[in-house]
Structures are given as C-alpha cells and as structure tokens.
C-alpha cells in the first residue's frame, strides 16, 4: 500500500509490457484518434447544443403547461434544461404502462436517473411518493426535434 493506504495498481490485461506493464497489447490508435475527434467536436459544438436544448426545453415546458392535469415536479429555473419531470394527475394513469405503449416512438423514463428500477429518493424528497407511478422523466438532446416534442405533447393531451 502507498502512503494513503491505497493498494498498488494491478495490470488491466496481462501478457505484455506496454503502458509500464499495466496493459498488454498494442493500443487501438484508431479508437484513440476517434475519441479525440469526438471530444473535439463536442467541445466545438457545446454552446450551440446548449442553446438548442434550452430552446427545445422551453417548447416542451410551454406545451406541457397547456395540458390540464399535468404539472412539472420542479418548475423552478434551477432545473437542468433538457431534463423535464412531470406528474400526470389522472386516476388510472400508470407511467410504466404509458412508457411501454409509446416505446416505439419515444424513450421516456420513470422517476430519476439516480434510482432506476427503485422508488426514487428524489421523488420522495419532493413529497411525491404517493404519486410515484404518475411521474415521467423526459430527456431532450441535440437530436430531438420540435416535431417530436409536439408529437409527445399531443400524445399526452390524448392521454388526458
């Protein structure tokens, strides 16, 4: 162990002396170059993508606000643009059934990403534990179109 009590690093792959014996085999230069180029593009487009997602977020939130019975779990300006959590206040609405029915069109989720497959501590902290089956999380990205947003809004309207 080192001075901090951390055990020494062991080899990831055995058989060669590349990377000071920590990794065997020739490095995949094409993957390294591809990753570097992807990072370069991501950095180059960061501001434009951020602006686009903020614009799409406003379109989605505006559309959702026109649907009676649907509310944002966090309408605050402090929420991250592009991640929209809503509660559908319809008696027989079940988020998992709804997601399954539209999974060929949209990728939605229940609750928070921090607790996939379990009751979300975020939803509980917001005081929504009794409505956990009515929460949907909508995530937008640079590939989301306004047409898709309007389609989802129309599907949500038809659900209520």
List each model region and its residues:
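Conserved C-terminal alpha-helix-loop-beta "cap" of PLP-dependent enzymes
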Residues: 83-137
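Conserved core segment of the aminotransferase class I/II
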Residues: 1-47
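Generic structural signal for well-ordered, non-membrane alpha-helical segments
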Residues: 24, 28-32, 46-57, 95, ...
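Conserved PLP-dependent catalytic core of the aminotransferase class-I/II
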Residues: 43-92, 96-101
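Structural detector of well-ordered beta-strand residues that form the stable sheet scaffold
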Residues: 10, 73, 107-109
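PLP-dependent enzyme catalytic core of the Aspartate aminotransferase-like
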Residues: 121-160
